[in-house]
Design a protein with these regions (language model features):
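N-terminal DNA-binding recognition helix of tyrosine site-specific recombinases/integrases
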Residues: 1-33, 80-83
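Short, charged phosphate-coordinating catalytic segments
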Residues: 20-27, 75-97, 184-188
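Hydrophobic (often cysteine-bearing) scaffold residues that line and stabilize catalytic clefts
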Residues: 7-14, 48, 67-68, 115, ...
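Long, amphipathic, Lys/Arg-enriched alpha-helical "connector/arm" segment
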Residues: 1, 33-67, 77-80, 88, ...
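Active-site/catalytic core of tyrosine-dependent DNA strand-transfer enzymes
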Residues: 46-53, 114-162, 172, 195
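Conserved tyrosine-mediated DNA breakage-rejoining catalytic core shared by Y-recombinases
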Residues: 30-36, 51, 78, 86-128, ...
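Catalytic-site neighborhood detector that most strongly recognizes the C-terminal catalytic loop/helix
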Residues: 37-38, 46, 100-107, 120, ...
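C-terminal catalytic core of tyrosine-transesterase DNA break-rejoin enzymes
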Residues: 6, 73-84, 150, 157, ...
Length: 214
């Protein structure tokens, strides 16, 4: 039809302008205070220091599956999402950096996870046992890695049912690190949360050294 292409071009230009304006000025910040707070109850997590110390102690002394125990310990150093943890492969480890491919991330973006000396030492120990396997946390499960329910089931057995979850490690880390006044952007980057507005589009500083210390 006559004029259809011109209408399409104008429409695309208008939509493009709207997106550019949002990215530059993040208009959502102006209305967030008028919205009701939403509190998720799906991911229980610990926040008190003594409770966290007890959790880490129980994981250290867990007598069940070696891979499961190591996965939970590694999670406490990296606080990544469940899938990247469970499906972690040796080929993703590059020295002091863990390169999580985009297809394993909820955000569909690759994630760089700087590894602390403790995390590297843990991987070195695991490699002596599972170094010949594809997956770091190898399992006899049909896919070769830990199932989604395995880690949660172990936490329940240790007495944390309804108190702390696998995803709760992320909430726990965020709460503790913010209380310790670590840089907010570094925390969000480590959690693979994309900063909104200008920061999300133009922020190229990954704060890797800072995140390693954090």
């Amino acid at each position: 039809r006559r004029g259809t292409k011109e209408v399409a071009k104008r429409t695309r230009a208008i939509i493009g302008s709207i997106f550019k304006y949002h990215m530059l000025y993040d208009v959502s910040e102006r209305v967030k205070d008028s919205l009701e707070d939403f509190t998720s109850e799906n991911h229980p997590h610990l926040t008190e220091k003594e409770d966290i110390k007890e959790l880490l102690h129980k994981v250290d002394n867990y007598k069940g599956s070696y891979e499961t125990r190591m996965a939970l310990k590694f999670l406490s150093y990296t606080f990544v999402r469940s899938r990247p943890l469970r499906e972690a492969e040796w080929t993703e480890i590059d020295g002091d950096m863990w390169r999580v491919p985009a297809h394993k991330e909820k955000t569909n973006r690759p994630l760089l996870v700087p590894l602390s000396t403790q995390a590297q030492a843990l991987l070195k120990e695991i490699k002596e046992i599972n170094g010949n396997k594809k997956y770091i946390f190898n399992s006899n499960y049909r896919d070769g890695f830990l199932s989604e329910s395995t880690l949660g089931r172990i936490l329940t057995r240790m007495g944390y049912g309804g108190k702390h979850s696998v995803h709760g490690y992320r909430h726990m880390a965020s709460t503790c690190l913010n209380e310790l006044e670590y840089d907010g952007d570094a925390i969000e980057l480590q959690l693979s949360h994309a900063p909104v507005g200008v920061r999300g589009v133009y922020n190229k500083a990954k704060k890797l050294n800072y995140r390693t210390k954090m």
